[in-house]
From Swiss-Prot:
Sites of N-palmitoyl cysteine lipidation: C18
Biased composition (Basic and acidic residues): 289-316
Name the record gives this protein: Outer membrane protein assembly factor BamD
Signal sequence segment: 1-17
Region (Disordered): 289-330
Alphabetized UniProt keyword annotations: Cell outer membrane, Lipoprotein, Membrane, Palmitate, Signal
Subunit text: Part of the Bam complex.
Lipidation (S-diacylglycerol cysteine): C18
Organism in which the protein naturally occurs: Pseudomonas aeruginosa (strain ATCC 15692 / DSM 22644 / CIP 104116 / JCM 14847 / LMG 12228 / 1C / PRS 101 / PAO1)
């Protein structure tokens, strides 16, 4: 029931936001007055109002003394207002217009930080989500943007934090590849699984996912009858990752059963067309390390960018099981996520 309440609150908040009138800015304000009001809004954490006034300042006084600073602070205001796309667009514009600005490294940093938090939306603050299973597009963008910052401004005050986040993001991307490899194993697409495991080993060295990638290779090669490759991969796994979850008392334990009960259509399409259940949760050391690193990274955000403390009390309440009610739900109940039974 808790999830239903959260969804209802989100819908009502969105409706209220869409129906409310946009804030109007007094046209008689001078440049300095408008800038000072925007600063007051930022200090009061009224980020939506600050965005409106900073945009008005830039449009009314494009060549004023505060124009460049307003563009820079607009990135920050959008980021704090939980509008990552707007923050990234504002950062790209500032970088394009002012590549030699003394604070352009701040624009690069906020651009990467916006992508870093892009997947952590409203529901993600309350619902338990495994970041290693989500679309890695934003993570790749964030990694590349932080890489630009550290390469162009190695002495920037934001470089150390960016490097730490890059380590986390690299581990996240590696763990995602491991999940894809497990998915291929579940679908019995063993060639694809072996290739994915080898990709992890070759491209994500020094990440916790390498051991899991080797385990995928061992299992896939065994299923393909490539015993020599399987033995080589297993010896490497035992030597470098003796505590991997796939090893029990030094012996390799496969995660998937040998039986192939799929239909001919499922086999012909490598499991893409099949009405079976989704792959089960695969607990890996890489996934656990990535989740811990994300939590550590959140605590290391500089003070001026540290998000407000959120109330996570909703996390402690587990939703009641609705399994017994699902069979009698109407199509309208499914369409509204059960809000209107």
């Amino acid at each position: 029931m808790q999830v239903k309440h959260l969804l209802l609150i989100a819908i009502l908040a969105l409706t209220a936001a869409c129906s409310s009138n946009k804030e109007t800015v007094d046209e008689n304000l001078s440049e300095s007055q408008l800038y000072q009001q925007a600063q007051d809004d930022l200090n009061n954490k009224s980020y939506n109002s600050a965005v409106t006034k900073l945009k008005a300042l830039e449009s009314r006084y494009p060549f004023g003394r505060y124009a460049e600073q307003a563009q820079l602070e607009l990135i920050y205001a959008n980021y704090k207002n939980m509008e990552p796309e707007a923050a990234r667009a504002a950062a790209e514009r500032f970088i394009r217009l002012h590549p030699q600005h003394p604070n352009v490294d701040y624009a690069y940093y906020l651009k990467g930080l916006s992508s870093f938090d892009q997947d952590r939306g409203l529901l993600a603050r309350f619902l338990p989500l495994d970041m290693t299973k989500r679309d890695p597009g934003a993570a790749r963008d964030s990694f590349n943007e932080f890489a630009q910052l550290t390469s162009r401004f190695p002495n920037s005050r934001y470089a150390p934090d960016a490097k730490a986040r890059m380590v986390y993001l690299r581990n996240l991307l590696a763990a995602y590849e491991v999940h894809v490899g497990h998915y291929y194993l579940k679908r019995q697409a063993y060639v694809a699984a072996a290739n994915r495991g080898r990709y992890v080993v070759e491209n994500f060295q020094e990440t916790p996912a390498v051991g899991d990638g080797l385990a995928i290779m061992v299992e896939a090669y065994r299923r393909l009858g490539l015993d020599d490759l399987a033995s080589t991969s297993l010896e490497t796994l035992k030597l470098n990752y003796p505590d991997n979850a796939s090893l029990k008392d030094g012996e390799f334990v496969a995660r998937e059963s040998e039986a192939d009960t799929r239909s001919w259509l499922a086999k012909a399409t490598l499991g893409l067309i099949e009405g079976g259940e989704p792959p089960p949760h695969m607990e890996t050391q890489a996934a656990k390390d990535v989740i811990k690193q994300y939590e550590d990274a959140e605590r290391e955000i500089p003070a001026e960018l540290k998000p407000e403390n959120q109330d996570h009390s909703a996390d402690d309440e587990k939703p009641e099981s609705d399994d017994d009610e699902d069979s009698g739900r109407s199509w309208w109940s499914y369409m509204t996520f059960g809000l209107f039974d």
